């Protein structure tokens, strides 16, 4: 298909396997084939390599691996966009093993959009208790109220939901509707960076655009759900952040990072997480059988949660 990709102007992108800088010429609109050629110059491996059947070699390996190693998860047994949405929001900041039971409990009480929309916010928060990052629950509730009982069916509409970003929208649309949108999360960054040997920082503007384009190029458009689920599982199980299983990796023979001995160095992040210490001093007040608590009104991640009287200080 002859679609176009808007390309950023006069940027310098660094290749893991070239000492020289690759100058990105100034384009306003560049045909996709030209962009693929640029990806080829950045990556050690030709991103367009295909099998005899015309399928991308990388994508085929990911899908074949997934068919043999996929994790059995309850939200994968349905193409219901509502259930997929709930699972993706839960997994934004929660490990799969921890989120499993919470997902089942949540959908048992709120099995569809309307039941969630009709619920009281305090009840929604109660069923979210233990997952943390409670703004996710508030966003779910607000988004459900905006749907009028029907989950949206287009990518722009899904993306417009409160609390839904590009990754979540791509996951929902590919898993529920079979739409060709590539997911890009931490697992995808890691797999693509290592396999293609790209050391452009994943948290830079250039890196985000580059990896989004590379992910889109690798996407199997005939099986987007299978491929997206596959590459995420591959990153979570096979190509892990620490101690990846390179010995039994189906991509080992053509992995740039492995051949260069740089698996532990990729992907690259340019900014380290800044940690700020906060000190909460809670006051326990009890009168007979009653304990004093109040609802937190501050506009932060704990908004509308109940807590003991609090004094926050800058030192311990």
How does the language model describe each region?
Residues 2-4, 14-17, 40, 52:
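Intrinsic-disorder-associated, low-complexity terminal segments enriched in Asp/Asn/His/Tyr and depleted
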């Amino acid at each position: 298909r002859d679609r176009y990709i808007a390309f950023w102007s006069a940027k310098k992108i660094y290749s893991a396997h070239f000492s020289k800088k690759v100058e990105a010429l100034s384009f306003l609109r560049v045909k996709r084939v030209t962009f693929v050629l640029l990806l080829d110059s950045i990556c050690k491996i030709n991103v367009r390599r295909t099998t005899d059947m015309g399928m991308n070699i990388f994508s085929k390996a990911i899908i074949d691996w997934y068919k043999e190693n996929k994790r059995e998860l309850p939200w994968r047994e349905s193409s219901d966009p509502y259930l997929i949405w709930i699972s993706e929001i839960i997994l934004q900041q929660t490990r799969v093993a921890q989120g499993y039971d919470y997902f089942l409990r949540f959908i048992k009480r709120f099995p569809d959009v309307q039941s969630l929309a009709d619920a009281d916010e305090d009840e929604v928060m109660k069923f979210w208790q233990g997952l943390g990052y409670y703004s996710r629950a508030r966003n779910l509730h607000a988004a459900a109220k905006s749907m009028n009982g029907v989950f949206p069916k287009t990518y722009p509409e899904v993306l417009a939901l409160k609390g839904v970003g590009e990754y979540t929208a791509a996951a929902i649309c590919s898993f529920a509707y079979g739409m060709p949108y590539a997911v890009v999360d931490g697992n995808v960054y890691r797999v693509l960076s290592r396999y293609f040997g790209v050391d452009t920082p994943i948290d830079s503007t250039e890196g985000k655009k580059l990896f989004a384009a590379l992910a889109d190029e690798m996407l199997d458009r005939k099986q987007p759900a299978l491929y997206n689920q596959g590459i995420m599982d591959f990153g979570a199980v096979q190509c892990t952040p620490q101690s990846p299983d390179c010995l039994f990796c189906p991509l080992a023979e053509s992995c740039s990072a492995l051949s260069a001995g740089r698996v532990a160095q990729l992907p690259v992040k340019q900014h380290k997480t800044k940690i700020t210490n906060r000190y909460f001093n809670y006051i326990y007040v009890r009168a007979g059988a009653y304990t004093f608590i109040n609802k937190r009104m501050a506009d932060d991640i704990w908004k509308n949660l109940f807590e003991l009287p609090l004094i926050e200080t800058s030192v311990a």
